[in-house]
Amino acid sequence: MTSSSTSPSSDRRAWIMLIVLTMLTTAGMTVVLPVLPFVVLRYVSNESDLAVWVGVLEAVNGLCAFLIAPFLGRLSDRFGRRPVIIVAALGAAVSMMLFGIGGALWVLLLARVIQGATAGDLPALFAYLADITPPEKRAQRFGLLGALSGIGTMVGPAVGGLLAAISVELPVFLTAAVSFVIALLCIFLLPESLRPENRIASIRVADLHPFAVFREAFGRRELRGLMIGFALLALPFGMFVNNFSVMAYDSIGWGPTAIGLLIAAVGIVDIIVQGALLGVLLPRMGERAVIVSGIIGQALGLAALALVASVLAQPWVFIAGSLLLAAGQGAAQAAMDGAMSNAVGADEQGWLGGATQSLNAAMSTVAPLLAGALYAVVSHAAPYCLGALLMVVAAVVIARARFTDAARLPRAASPSAVDAAA
């Protein structure tokens, strides 16, 4: 396909909406992170069961996302990115309202089911970015979008931790409000990015089965190594995210405010790495070297956290390990997103988003259960030791994976709604 030009004003409008939606989405998702264990703690009879129940709630969320992600991805390829983003935002608003109202563990479980079943906003936003970006610029722009996510990650937990001093439910209700605002912005201001000629003609039933999506994605030579690496990265990072607040509470006695401030610092690191450093590193090192370097950083960060959970329960080690892990994840994920996006065509960006979201959801189903079980039964350090080992394996896989040369890829036609806005 050949590219057509877009006016500076229409391109600027699309970018402004991407910036606003990405920051609001990540801020809304992360506001609740510092308070999640403390909300759950109200409904468990034994505090020692906290890690297990947090794991169960996140696993339910991941399982539902795993089952529905291929459908949402293909919907965005058929009807556009905008409807999927709207549905995801409304689903998040409803689920967070239920979670805040609570009353029993089954209500919290229902809320996570709704959240997982409508979790298509970030993949659709990244597909939107791929629609309006030429292949050779995708890795860098995914890095910029990751930096915007970092701003949301910085603001969300800090606000959540501060509001928790008033009520642990208040950040949850704030998340619901932010999600509703996102839906309104999409309805009234977001232009569609996917041109009619780049949409698929129909949706095959086979495309909606998550295992069928995996079979096709892992069956492609240009995607196989990247998808394996993606899974190996997602599992340990998922264990970290879902066990982070519990370990901070158990090992160094932190409450919601301190946890929220550290997650905000993680967001600052994301901004620096993805917003500034990647623009310098990618042209000099290439995607493969950036990904491998990021993986090594994550492995070292997880090793530091294992020390905190076992023999060195010092806040400075916990902070250093978390920030190193965040820096490595930010670099590796942005470069990985760009590499995978370049491996498929313009009419498959939604399919790819559904495939990676489904794979990430599968890991998000396994990760909290595995982390909770290892943490409660084996040792507090076990999830982080396993995570560091998996990172080493991921580095080897990515070092041998096939990468597509972006310069050889055709450019997608520019988005129709963006053209119409000119």
Predicted regions and their residues:
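Juxtamembrane intracellular "pre-TM" segments in multi-pass secondary transporters
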Residues: 2-12, 191-228, 416-422
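Central cavity-lining transmembrane alpha-helices of secondary-active solute carriers
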Residues: 56-72, 264-277
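Helix-to-loop junctions at the C-terminal end of transmembrane segments
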Residues: 68-79, 273-287, 375
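C-terminal ends and interior cores of transmembrane alpha-helices
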Residues: 90-103, 297-312
